[in-house]
Each structure stands twice: as C-alpha cells, then as structure tokens.
Amino acid sequence: MTVSRVCLLLLVALVYLDCCYAASIPRNFDPRLSEEIVMAPKKRPFCNAFTGCGRKRSQGPPGMPAQDLRTKQYLDEEALGSILDSESAIDELSRQILSEAKLWEAIQEASAEIARRKQKEAYIQ
C-alpha cells in the first residue's frame, strides 16, 4: 500500500512537472519586431539647410554610390594637398584671403556710412 501511494505520488508529480514545463505564459508578441530591429539602434535623419532632411548620415548623396563618393573625396584631398604643398600657392591663397578681408571691411564701412546718412536725414526732417 505504501509502495502504491509512493508510485501514485511520483506519477502525479511527473504529470504536474510535465504540465508546468509545457505551459507557456501568453504575451503580446508583435511579429514585426525581430531581434535585429530591437537590437539595432535607430538613426534619426540628418537635417541641414543645404540638403534638407530625409536621409541618414551614413547614406551618401542621392545618385552617388558610397564608393564613388569616397574616391572623389580622396582625389579632392589629394589635389588640395598638392596645391598647398607649393609655397607660391600658399602665398597666393594668403593674398586672396587678405583682399577678401579688406573688401569685407570696406563693405561694412560703406554700410555704416549709409546708415548714418539715413539716420541724419531722418533727424533733420
């Protein structure tokens, strides 16, 4: 009698464990969410005044593959490096920068003079 009770208790325990193991807790599972989507960080689009919004920073400009973009950038850097290596080019660039600065100062002085004249005319009237 005790052996049959032990066997019966063991059988009930095994059935109970099997039911617990096989049971699953229902949860709301969205099939659109996969591990790749959840684990990968989302990038926000890069916005600026020149290109606008709607593309990610890692994307190249529309119509230009990334490899071509890298090649073009490398060639531009190489050309710029060879130009800056020559001393005469550096001197010419310095002269251009100084002339642009002088032109900017002249424009600012002319704008200030025009503003003073307008203010003087408004005061007289």
UniProtKB/Swiss-Prot annotation:
Protein's cellular compartments: Secreted
Segments passing through the bilayer: none
Residues making up the signal peptide according to the UniProt record: 1-22
InterPro entries referenced in this protein's UniProt entry, alphabetically: CCAP
Recorded superkingdom: Eukaryota
Major subcellular site: secreted
Disulfide partners: 47-53
GO cellular component, one term: extracellular region
Propeptide stretches in the record: 23-42, 57-125
Task performed by this protein: Cardioregulatory neurohormone that increases heart beat rate during adult wing inflation; has no effect on beat amplitude. The effect of CCAP is both ino- and chronotropic.
A GO BP entry: neuropeptide signaling pathway
Expression by tissue: Abdominal perivisceral organ; major neurohemal release site. Expressed in 116 neurons in post-embryonic central nervous system. Nine pairs of cells are observed in the brain, 4.5 pairs in the subesophageal ganglion, three pairs in each thoracic ganglion (T1-T3), three pairs in the first abdominal ganglion (A1), five pairs each in the second to sixth abdominal ganglia (A2-A6) and 7.5 pairs in the terminal ganglion. Expressed in every ganglion in each post-embryonic stage, except in the thoracic ganglia of first- and second-instar larvae.
UniProt GO molecular function: neuropeptide hormone activity
Protein name: Cardioactive peptide
Gene that encodes it: CCAP
Keywords for the protein's UniProt record, in alphabetical order: Amidation, Cleavage on pair of basic residues, Disulfide bond, Hormone, Neuropeptide, Secreted, Signal
Modified residues (Cysteine amide): 53
